[in-house]
A protein has these predicted regions:
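Cytoplasmic/organellar membrane-interface segments at the starts of transmembrane helices
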Residues: 82, 205, 215-218, 273-346
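Hydrophobic transmembrane alpha-helices and their helix-loop junctions in integral membrane proteins
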Residues: 1-242, 246-272, 276-277, 282
Length: 346
């Protein structure tokens, strides 16, 4: 625990320092940090060593903060040792804000045809592909629920970076949709992790046998969010991946499409292994020797599933994941299309 906290403190400080260093180089080259002024000034400085150095520092700084491969070292330990109430915040907010900041910085300041953006697309594309495959494959190795979710997040952040690397309307739409949808999906899964610890002290997926009988809402939340993470319709996760695939096809980036399909299959494998234990394990969690003692000492025992204060967030997450999927066309046409076409791609 203390080691993980110190690692996060150290890497977080490095990430923030790299961002500030990049901002310093940018100011040295342009004399301003106003984004509107920067967008005009950098046109004449494309290829400048200070601008290139600034962009490199920004990629590292944002990459550390959003746990983008290979700058993700702090994230698995943070999720493994953090308090259950903090995990949804880490997954839902802390790694999404720098992703949005990266979008604003690169696409609102630099033009798509510039040397800086060519470098950005190449670097972030490699990081995205490696991160998606690394996170998905590492998640297969673990039976600890939080470890699975932590490494899954590394892959999911890769989807956001892939949208940036695609760089067209569909790619950025997929990236923004995934920022929002993953915030709900992964928060919901970490809510279920906290609920399992609170109710039964469960950490391992091998301890989930027939838990759905005692915790139906928790199990439903886990199922909806996991299916959305895999990318099954009509949930939110399907549509963000759909737009990423459309953008990659439009650009002729078929490697990205192959990686999307492969990672979705890997996600299906590790989540269906969880479902197998949750719904199909013949021996119930109460009968298993490794969990019986924990359950007898449970804070809630065998009464109601959870206090209502803990149930409401999970119900909100279920509704959000479904509604974001059902109404995604309205979100894209009425909100994202004007913002992206008149802002990032103007």
């Amino acid at each position: 625990g203390p080691i993980a906290a110190f690692r996060y403190l150290l890497t977080g400080t490095i990430g923030a320092s790299m961002y500030l260093l990049g901002a310093g180089f940018l100011y040295s080259a342009t004399g301003t940090l106003n984004m509107a002024d920067l967008a005009e000034t950098v046109k004449d400085l494309d290829g400048s060593p200070l601008i290139i150095l600034s962009v490199g520092c920004m990629i590292v700084g944002f990459g550390i903060k959003m746990a983008l491969f290979p700058l993700h070292g702090w994230q698995p330990a943070a999720h493994s040792y953090a308090h259950p109430a903090a995990d949804p915040m880490i997954a839902g907010v802390m790694i999404k804000v720098p992703a949005y900041a990266m979008l604003r910085f690169f696409f609102f300041i630099f033009k798509e045809e510039s040397m800086v953006m060519d470098m950005f697309f190449d670097v972030i594309g490699v990081m995205a592909v490696c991160g998606i495959l690394f996170g998905s494959l590492k998640a297969l190795r673990y039976s600890t629920y939080n470890k699975i979710l932590a490494y899954s997040s590394i892959g999911q952040v890769g989807y956001i970076a892939m949208g940036f690397a695609i760089g067209n309307f569909y790619g950025l739409t997929g990236a923004v949709l995934h920022i929002v949808s993953h915030a709900f999906m992964k928060s919901g899964l970490f809510y279920t992790s906290g609920a399992l610890k609170y109710k039964f002290g469960i950490h391992e997926t091998t301890q989930l046998g027939q838990v759905y009988r005692q915790m139906p809402v928790t199990s439903l939340t886990m199922t909806v969010c996991a299916l959305s993470m895999i990318g099954l319709p009509p949930f939110a996760g399907f549509f963000s991946k759909w737009y990423l695939a459309l953008g990659a096809i439009e650009n002729g980036q078929y490697l990205f499409v192959a990686v999307l399909i492969a990672s979705s299959l890997l996600s299906a494998i590790y989540f269906f292994r969880v479902f197998e234990k949750l719904f199909m394990e013949s021996k119930t969690a109460f009968e298993r020797k490794d969990t019986a003692a924990l359950m007898e000492k449970s804070a809630v025992g065998r009464r109601l599933e959870l206090p209502w204060q803990l149930m409401i967030p999970m119900l909100v997450v279920i509704a959000a994941v479904i509604l974001l999927g059902l109404f995604n066309s309205y979100i894209v046409d009425d909100i994202l299309r004007p913002a992206i076409m008149e802002g990032a791609l103007s």
